[in-house]
Swiss-Prot record:
One Pfam family this sequence matches: Annexin
Xref: InterPro entries: Annexin (IPR001464), Annexin_repeat (IPR018502), Annexin_repeat_CS (IPR018252), Annexin_sf (IPR037104), ANX8 (IPR009115)
Annexin repeats: 21-92, 93-164, 177-249, 253-324
A Gene Ontology molecular function term of the record: calcium-dependent phospholipid binding
UniProt xrefs under SMART domains: ANX
Residues given in the record as Ca(2+) binding sites: 266, 268, 270, 310
The name this protein goes by in its record: Annexin A8
PANTHER family for this protein: ANNEXIN (PTHR10502), ANNEXIN A8-RELATED (PTHR10502:SF133)
Keywords for this protein: Annexin, Blood coagulation, Calcium, Calcium/phospholipid-binding, Hemostasis, Metal-binding, Repeat
Family: Belongs to the annexin family.
PROSITE patterns in UniProt: ANNEXIN_1 (PS00223), ANNEXIN_2 (PS51897)
UniProt lineage: Eukaryota, Metazoa, Chordata, Craniata, Vertebrata
Amino acid sequence: MAWWKAWVEQEGVSVKGSPHFNPDPDAETLYKAMKGIGTNEQAIIDVLTKRSNAQRQQIAKSFKAQFGKDLIETLKSELSGKFERLIIALMYPPYRYEAKELYDAMKGIGTKEGVIIEILASRTKNQLQEIMKAYEEDYGSNLEEDIKADTSGYLERILVCLLQGSRDDLSGYVDPGLALQDAQDLYAAGEKICGTDEMKFITILCTRSATHLMRVFEEYEKIANKSIEDSIKSETHGSLEEAMLTVVKCTRNLHGYFAERLYFAMKGAGTLDGTLIRNIVSRSEIDLNLIKNQFKKMYGKTLSSMIMEDTSGDYKNALLNLVGSDL
């Protein structure tokens, strides 16, 4: 499946919102849930996880109009920990949320390259343009310039190349001659020589459409007698290897890529809550149902069953509401 198709597959939406929506009573319910001593977390879960993002924005406006308070700030003052992080993530408009995730990945000491790679490799050109716009509006800074300042070398090159969103081609047309040439160029840039021409890999992986790349990967395997993934693993390392492999995974099976991200966020000791929250929130109104199907196929268990094993309390209940039934 081409990596961009998930953006137009409505059957994938797990959070559809309320069909008979009125923001005013919802805002009142939230106000009462946080008024006085103690907080009614279940009431907050029932409202915010069962509304679409657009509906949540209307609730926030109604909350401000009725009670003179900012809903996000009020939620922050009443909630804490992972549950707070999840609920606040739900309140951001999608592009602003992803801009915030990118900003947080780069601010302070150290850079969370994995977050940047995940977002840039899996979004469409239009989505990336909206994220860049939101980033500039919210942080008064240019996303591309910040990435350049925060990364270096070939990782910087591939991230900037991905940010330009040159891979979109909805026509599905593939030039067999060019696909073969690209496969030969990749082989010549890696397996055939001592050392690696990283820029050749970056140029082809970041500027060709998904349908074209699928053909390139087929041709490459015939020439090299190994998969493109195996060659990337032997020719590169670290964050550059992760970025290239992510592009390949998103090209081959976008839903499989997100299923893998969710699985490894929960597998083993500890939980990568940032990865879990980001991927469930950001895909809930796009293709989370399709990701759930892929998750079950790949790992032999449901996403919700793994969430139940790995999380607890209000945090668990809110996540399960967003994921929906996947028995």
